[in-house]
Design a protein with these regions (language model features):
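Short cysteine clusters
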Residues: 92
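Cys-dependent protein tyrosine phosphatase-like superfamily
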Residues: 1-89, 100-141
């Protein structure tokens, strides 16, 4: 259910509020929601997820990514949350947006783009198409 990309970040598709307790038992210290509220019927909103995370003793951060794509404020927010300490579980509908946002955030802090691509591939995600952006961000770090 939770796909480990590195020791500090795992991703998942949509989780339910009760999954926060499971995440805590698996050693996660924070949950990042990358899914906008109301994206799909029946989806728990960020407030419900934040309450469940707090009840499980976890930090919670909502960095929604909609279909318009990624912007630097979102990359910076993800990087800040990752820097606050992990391991962290990030989720969206399928885990793809969370993986892509992690990749951009990691590159923005100087992580080698090829190692980012390899870590994502190890979890079943292909971010190789982002290599030019990852290299640009890593070069500026």
């Amino acid at each position: 259910m939770f796909i480990r990309l590195t020791p500090d970040i795992s991703v998942a598709g949509q989780i339910a509020p009760e999954d926060c307790a499971l995440a805590a038992t698996q050693g996660f210290v924070a949950i990042i929601s990358n899914r906008p509220d109301g994206e799909a019927p029946g989806q728990p909103d960020a407030a419900a997820m934040a309450a469940a995370a707090a009840a499980a003793g976890l930090r919670f951060c909502h960095i929604p990514i909609d279909h318009s794509g990624f912007a630097m404020p979102q990359v910076e927010a993800m990087a800040a949350e990752l820097a606050a300490g992990g391991p962290v579980l990030a989720f969206c509908r399928s885990g793809t947006r969370s993986t892509n946002l992690w990749a951009l955030a990691a590159a923005s802090h100087g992580t080698d783009p090829d190692s980012i691509v390899a870590a994502a591939a190890g979890g079943g995600y292909d971010v190789s198409g982002m290599l030019p952006s990852l290299r640009m961000l890593a070069d500026k770090a």
